[in-house]
């Protein structure tokens, strides 16, 4: 009897106890990030965050990584510092730079508290043992030296700084859209070096994730969402229903279903207020 009791106790002792409030906050941030859809394996719920999803880019294919708390194949051995450095600085625990397909360029704007709450949530989930797959990039993009050079030119790891001239609602929407939901990562066209074109932020991209079109979400009347009201934007993020009754497909449908639809109406409205305030940019996104 004593042996039967000792074994579970030993197992439990190796599982870190997470603060339930941090887990709850982290789950909300996880949803605000779109449910980390890129880290799942399509059609396999058992590995919903264990990586393996191929993400096509103009430079080759990269695979979503295992972000479950498995200690050997996931992030289960990561310290708080490791997690912060990955999310905010794009560096692995081994000191290697991550490819910027991982949107640390946006997550860098998150607060330390929010990043660690997200970690608490991920570490509360069941671990899944699944090895990560190496990227399939062509030369020279398959070298870490090229990543380091890219970072020197295009990465500025600064936190979000509230704009005192704007409302609290606007700042909340800006923080969610820019940092947590990382909308600009998909909806901003890229330069030939794969960096976001800062002069056309949110203006849409023909080279979206998995070869999909990422529409213009600036308030341009003809090529963007200038004809949408804040209510239209909020409703879309809740239901995936466009103002004309159609719906988004592909990855956007996934991030709404796994993430955005679970957010509070006030947060979705804040995102809408922020998007409506952006400079309208004319850019009709078409297939190449």
Task: Report the location of each language-model feature.
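Sequence context of c-type cytochrome heme-c attachment sites
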Residues: 10-12, 23-27, 47-73, 101-105, ...
């Amino acid at each position: 009897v004593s042996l039967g009791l000792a074994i579970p106790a030993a197992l439990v002792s190796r599982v870190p106890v997470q603060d339930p409030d941090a887990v709850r906050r982290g789950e909300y941030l996880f949803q605000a990030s779109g449910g980390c859809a890129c880290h799942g394996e399509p059609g396999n719920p058992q590995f919903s965050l264990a990586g393996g999803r191929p993400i096509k880019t103009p430079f080759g294919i990269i695979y979503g990584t295992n972000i479950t708390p498995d200690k050997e194949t996931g992030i289960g051995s990561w310290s708080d510092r490791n997690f912060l450095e990955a999310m905010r600085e794009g560096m692995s625990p081994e000191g290697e730079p991550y490819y910027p397909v991982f949107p640390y360029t946006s997550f860098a704007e998150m607060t330390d508290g929010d990043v660690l709450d997200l970690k608490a949530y991920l570490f509360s989930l069941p671990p899944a043992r699944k090895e990560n797959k190496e990227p399939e990039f062509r030369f020279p993009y398959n070298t870490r030296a090229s990543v380091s050079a890219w970072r020197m030119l295009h990465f500025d790891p600064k936190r979000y700084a509230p704009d005192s001239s704007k409302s609290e609602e606007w700042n909340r929407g800006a923080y969610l859209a820019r940092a947590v939901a990382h909308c600009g990562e998909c909806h901003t066209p890229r330069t030939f070096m794969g960096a976001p074109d800062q002069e056309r932020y949110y203006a849409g991209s023909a080279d979206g994730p998995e070869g999909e079109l990422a529409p213009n979400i600036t308030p341009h009347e003809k090529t963007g969402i200038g004809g949408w009201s804040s209510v239209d934007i909020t409703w879309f993020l809740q239901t995936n229903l466009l103002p004309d009754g159609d719906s988004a497909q592909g990855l956007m449908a996934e991030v709404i279903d796994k993430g955005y639809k679970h957010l509070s109406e006030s947060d979705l409205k804040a995102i809408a207020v922020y998007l409506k305030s952006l400079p309208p940019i004319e850019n009709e996104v078409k297939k190449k």
